[in-house]
Each structure stands twice: as structure tokens, then as C-alpha cells.
A protein has these predicted regions:
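Short, hinge-like loop/turn segments at secondary-structure boundaries
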Residues: 1-2, 26, 112-113, 145-146
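Glycine/GP-enriched mid-protein hinge/lid loop-to-helix segment characteristic of carbohydrate kinases
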Residues: 1-86, 153
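Acidic-glycine-rich active-site phosphate/pyrophosphate-binding loop
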Residues: 25-33, 111-120
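Adenine-nucleotide phosphate-binding core of ATP-dependent small-molecule kinases
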Residues: 44-112, 119-138
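Short amphipathic alpha-helical signal-transduction/dimerization elements
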Residues: 55, 146-149
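Residues within well-ordered alpha-helical secondary structure of globular protein domains
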Residues: 60, 144-147
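Binuclear metal-ion centers of metallo-dependent hydrolases, dominated by the metallo-beta-lactamase
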Residues: 141
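Acidic, glycine/GT-rich loop-and beta-edge segments that sit at the periphery of enzyme/chaperone cores
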Residues: 148-157
Length: 157
């Protein structure tokens, strides 16, 4: 349905991938979306919004957080990084996966509000939760292994 997708995993760290027509777009330097600088080198996206950052700041993992105030704070941090990734890549849709994204419903309204409030002159693409939120990396690795095996089998016969 969508040709150009930005996938962002928010888990222990933060990673991202661009997908065009169902295929990941490899880059020559293997950058990670979580390494973008938000304000200073100490404030990289994954240093303030990853599962590790959440556990470090609040003393508990995302699954244990019930406070709306805390989720608003987390949402502000997620919004900062997502906005910059969206501006840099201009995707049709953003898909969120990973252990923190399992809690999508707890933070997505606040993320959208923060993005609109802080950067109101840009139309945001839809931001959706991945279907297999926590298992996407494993499924992707399995599909890649299968594709590699098929390619190898075709080229050796």
C-alpha cells in the first residue's frame, strides 16, 4: 500500500530503516536513527528515548510505567527524534516497533501533539504501530536468511 516507509524500532536502543517498494534501502555507512543528535552529543535520540534511557531515568522498564505524567515526558522525547527522522526522510508512513512501541497507545497521542506543537508547519505522515511489534527484528532476520539461502541456491546450481 505504501511505497516509502520509515520503520523505527524503540527498544533497548533505537534503530531505523527506510523501505522502498517492500525492500530496505541499504546505506554505505550503516547509520542508526537513534544516533541522531537532538541538542548535544549527550542527547542523542536513543540516549533520551530508548528503553534503556527510560529504565535509567525512571528506575523501571516501560511495561511497569503507569503514570500519565511520565508517559507525557517520554512522549516529548520520542517526538523530538521522530520529527527529525521524518523531516530527513519524508516517508509516506512511519511504523514503530520494539519493546517500547508495545505501549504505543500510552504515548502516540502525546507524541503527535508534541510534534504539532513544536513544529506546526509540517504535515506529518501517519504513525502506526508495527503488527509484530517486539518480534519484527526476528522475523526480518528470518526472511533475510531465507532470501539469502534462495539466492545462494539459485547461483550455485
Amino acid at each position: 500500500k505504501h511505497r516509502f516507509i520509515l520503520y523505527v524500532t524503540i527498544s533497548t536502543g533505537i534503530g531505523s530503516a527506510l523501505i522502498l517498494d517492500g525492500n530496505p534501502i541499504p546505506g554505505p555507512h550503516n547509520p542508526e536513527g537513534g544516533r541522531i543528535l537532538l541538542k548535544t552529543p549527550a542527547e542523542r535520540f536513543e540516549k533520551i528515548a530508548s528503553g534503556t534511557a527510560i529504565r535509567h531515568r525512571y528506575g523501571r522498564i516501560a511495561a511497569q510505567i503507569r503514570s500519565r505524567r511520565v508517559w507525557r515526558e517520554i512522549s516529548e522525547e520520542i517526538a523530538l527524534g521522530l520529527y527529525d527522522l521524518i523531516l530527513a526522510t519524508d516517508p509516506e508512513i512511519v511504523i514503530l516497533g520494539g519493546g517500547v512501541a508495545v505501549h504505543y497507545k500510552k504515548f502516540i497521542k502525546e507524541v503527535r501533539s508534541a510534534m504539532q506543537r513544536n513544529r506546526p508547519f509540517y504535515t506529518l505522515p501517519p504513525i502506526k504501530q508495527a503488527q509484530y511489534t517486539e518480534h519484527a527484528p526476528l522475523l526480518g532476520a528470518m526472511l533475510l536468511a531465507d532470501d539469502t539461502a534462495r539466492h545462494h541456491a539459485q547461483n550455485t546450481h
